[in-house]
Structure formats: C-alpha cells, structure tokens
Amino acid sequence: MIKIGQINSLEVIKKADFGVFLDGDDYGSVLLPNKHVPEGTELGDHIEVFLYFDSESQLAATIDKPIAQVGEWGLMKIEGINQTGAFVNWGIKEKDLLIPFSEQRARFTAGQNILVYVYTDKASGRIVGTTKFNKWLDKTPANYEVNEEVDLIIAERSQLGYKAIVNGKHWGMIFPSDVFGKLFIGKKLKGYIKQVREDGKIDLSLQKVGVAKMDDLSSKIIELLEKKGGFLPLNDKSSPEAIFDAFRTSKGTYKKTIGGLYKQGKIVIEKDGIRLA
C-alpha cells in the first residue's frame, strides 16, 4: 500500500514520450515526468519517489527528497506569506508546503528558518505543516532509564535552556550547564536521559551522566587512539570545540577522563596531544 507524503518504491508500468507511469495501487497510475526519470529506466523497474498532491489536488510523484516526510520534523525556510498562511521550502521543487495561520504558534516573516512538523490534514487530505507541536507528542508518562540514549531535535531556546523533542514523542530540557558544542533550532543529535522527574518532565544531557560518562568516554578515547596509530592531537590544552568535534563531550569531562587514563598508565599526555602508553 502506497503512503502519501512519504517516499515509496513504485514499479514502472508504462512508458510515454513525456515520462513514465508508476503503479499507484488504489490510486491508479502515477505520472513521473521525464525530468525525474533516471536514465535507462525500463518497464518493471522500481523507482523511489515522493508522493504528494499538486496544486490541482492530483497525485504527483517526484524524485526530490523532502526535508521532512509526513510524521517528521524538519528545519525549513519561509519562502512567502499570503492570506492563507506561510509557505516553506520543504525540498520539493514543484510545490512549497503550507503552514496555515491556525497552525502557527507565532507570526513569521519571509526568510525565516523554522522547525516544522509535517502531517496530513484529515479534513482536506492535504499535506500541511505546523509549528504547534504539543498535539503531536505523547501525553502518557515517559518510561526512560537514566543514561538511555535518545534521538533529539532542538525545538526551542529559552532562559532555562534548550527544549528538545525526545524520540519524536516527548518534550525534554537541556539546561545551560549541560550545553556544549553548537546547538540551534532544528538540529538533530543524540542525547541521554539525565532524569525523569516525578512530575514527568525530562532532563536531558548530551553525554552520559555519573560514572558511566567517564567509563564510556575512556573506551572511546582508547578505541580512537588505537585506530589512529596510538596518537591523538588532543590534550588538556585543546579547544572545547576540537574536543567536542572528536568526542561530543565537554572539555572538563575530557580533562578528567584523560587524567584518569594517565593515572592508570594507559596513556601519556604530551604537549601536543595524547599517546598510548
């Protein structure tokens, strides 16, 4: 069964001068214009296409890859605004994505980059976007373990820190003391559960917490040293940015960890890096 608003692998069932027709199952045949048809395509081949409804409400196919499919979040640029709402570039050249005014948490201006959730409007059947995320998140209590790895999408910034969507289901918060490296709205990254409070709110960390944090980083450092021939140009004098790029951890945690490895006799700390002992 094909899925509108998502990428599907469809069979070529007919060729024409202006393109090929794909098997759209219950929707019948779907035209893929020549500009989207891969060279050498033959009958019976399967092509990965994104399916959506065009401006005339006809089912259309494209090989363009959307920034976000139905059920996903993505950072998108506002291309224009009219009396209907804001239109964003979601990666499909033939048609921008509409965010109706009723689905906007704030009024936007052209040129802004905003985080958008893509969904299918049940009343009209159209694929649209929203910046009102609460109704798409799970309201049931979260069941996470401390130090459990999760997928994060940075959604908002406030005085408290960064609000993030956890595994596409729950809200979580990264407090300033747990922020290192560059974070921005729409960034997708791995994180860890710091704690789930009694009121259900989730505190997040970008690295494991407690003893597990140090043990995990120690293993990563030794593993990378072995891969790099026993030397890494990163020591306790290296920049926080360089350390984060290599290990996604803070400089403070890195310094403590290599200090521990040094005391254990596993590494030697040199003026320009660290070396396996």
Which sequence ranges carry the predicted segments?
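Single-stranded RNA-binding regions, centering on S1/OB-family and related RNA-binding modules
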Residues: 1-277
